[in-house]
Amino acid sequence: MAAKDVKFGGDARQRMLRGVDILADAVKVTLGPKGRNVVIDKSFGAPRITKDGVSVAKEIELADKFENMGAQMVREVASKTNDKAGDGTTTATVLTQAIVREGAKAVAAGLNPMDLKRGIDKAVAVVIEDLKANSRKITNPSETAQVGTISANGESEIGRMISEAMQKVGNEGVITVEEAKGIQTELDVVEGMQFDRGYVSPYFITNPEKMIAELDNPYILIHEKKLAQLQPLLPLLESVVQSGRPLLIIAEDVEGEALATLVVNKLRGGLKIAAVKAPGFGDRRKAMLEDIAILTGGTVISEDLGIKLETVTLQQLGTAKRVLIEKENTTIVEGAGSPDDIKGRCSQIRAQAEETTSDYDREKLQERLAKLAGGVAVIRVGGSTEVEVKERKDRVDDALHATRAAVEEGIVPGGGVALARASLKLADLGYDNGDQKVGIEIIRRALQSPLRQISENAGEDGAVIAGKVLENGTYNFGFDAQTGEFKDLVSAGIIDPAKVVRTALQDAASVAALLITTEAMIAEKPEKKAPAGAPPGGMGDMDF
């Protein structure tokens, strides 16, 4: 086991604080509409330019092990806030730095760190209640667009697109962000349920120009095993032919005699039919087939349930208004499933997503939820250069998460004002002893730091701006750093999601309190490397 280096008390806290400051100073320059960019060197390719706090935080690794521990703790704050709310990482970093700075001074002055922590926790609880009381629900698409615009650093086109996407696919819908090939940023919406499997054979195509198969008002057979023999299918095919409606077969695979006969019938015009493979693999495939069955009002034909293909009736088939089948995708539009069944299935998937510990599983469950709930929107981000596209994509991701958070828990005035106003609520908060009072005071000061930082990034004096904002009793009154004016921020469209502000404060206070109560730090001693040996001597007349 390698030897360890141990630091105690003030020495440990000082080193840790240096690490916190290095990381926070690099991140906080990005805060607000006039925040600056940070350029990050890459081991290959062009450097990356970003204004996204968490992207900057993730790149910072310090040589001194003790400083690095402080920096990594703040990085953890940014990551956690990003995971929970998707935005607010820079605000969380600024708050952490402010709380740790003041807290370290208080501990150095001999105050009890545990009482400081209790005071901090008390104050945070009061502020969160104040944020909840003052947040208001989003009522129209223009407010949704404003949240997106603020989070995308004032780019209104991004805000408008996100608002439009959410209108089309609903708040539960999946909105993915991709890099576009051209200069334009565009929105593409796929309504209905889409899965990534296309036709089994190109002979099923009905529209040769577009290379797609279109089925109007089809029956849908959902079968979890392979279809190789035609015999079990015959009774069902006869019923479908008599009904005069098309048939879509979704099965693990369709091959051999079954496929050949279906293709021949399709070409002769006797039967409008198409077959696609079932989406997903293993247990996920079963779950997705069940989703399709619920969406279309059908039944999964499975031997587990004791249903044999020979006995299937038309009542056990699903139906939909329209099905589009491309080479690699199938879209089911307006399935005929009962809305109550679909809602029930959505609740079940939502519960699974909350319980799972795997990010991958959660992402897949959310995709399934979106497909059931209404559709998928894709925002393709364009730009003149690759670096610009990546930078804009970061901002679109932030804006998307912020908008979702705003729909969830409502909005508060932006520009750091909601936290600054909440600091006034701490003036007469009760405490058990003097040290707790100092903890409350630490939070009271820290709550003004985001407002001050936004003002300083815009070239103003942070203390003066904070003073003017708090002198005015109107809750929504604040400083618009973009124009340099004081105004009603909510009516000017400068708003933050309450969830983002709440999460930033909770995560910052949690980690900062841990840093303040640290008394010892342990790190591995760097190994002393032996000096390299001298090169061998030359041989005789060999000149180099």
Curated annotation (Swiss-Prot):
Lineage of the organism: Bacteria, Pseudomonadati, Pseudomonadota, Alphaproteobacteria, Acetobacterales
SUPFAM superfamilies (UniProt xref): GroEL apical domain-like, GroEL equatorial domain-like, GroEL-intermediate domain like
UniProt record, GO biological process: protein refolding
Database matches in Gene3D superfamilies: GroEL, GroEL-like equatorial domain, TCP-1-like chaperonin intermediate domain
Keywords on record: ATP-binding, Chaperone, Cytoplasm, Isomerase, Nucleotide-binding
UniProt protein name: Chaperonin GroEL
Location of this chain's protein in the cell: Cytoplasm
Top-level taxon of origin: Bacteria
Record's GO cellular component terms: cytoplasm
Chain sites annotated for binding ATP: T30, L31, G32, P33, K51, D87, G88, T89, T90, T91, G415, D496
Subunit structure: Forms a cylinder of 14 subunits composed of two heptameric rings stacked back-to-back. Interacts with the co-chaperonin GroES.
Enzyme Commission number(s): 5.6.1.7
Gene Ontology terms, MF aspect: ATP binding; ATP-dependent protein folding chaperone; isomerase activity; unfolded protein binding
Function statement: Together with its co-chaperonin GroES, plays an essential role in assisting protein folding. The GroEL-GroES system forms a nano-cage that allows encapsulation of the non-native substrate proteins and provides a physical environment optimized to promote and accelerate protein folding.
Organism: Granulibacter bethesdensis (strain ATCC BAA-1260 / CGDNIH1)
First-tier enzyme category under EC: isomerase
Pfam families in the record: Cpn60_TCP1 (PF00118)
Catalysis performed (reactions): ATP + H2O + a folded polypeptide = ADP + phosphate + an unfolded polypeptide
Location (main, coarse): cytoplasm
Family statement: Belongs to the chaperonin (HSP60) family.
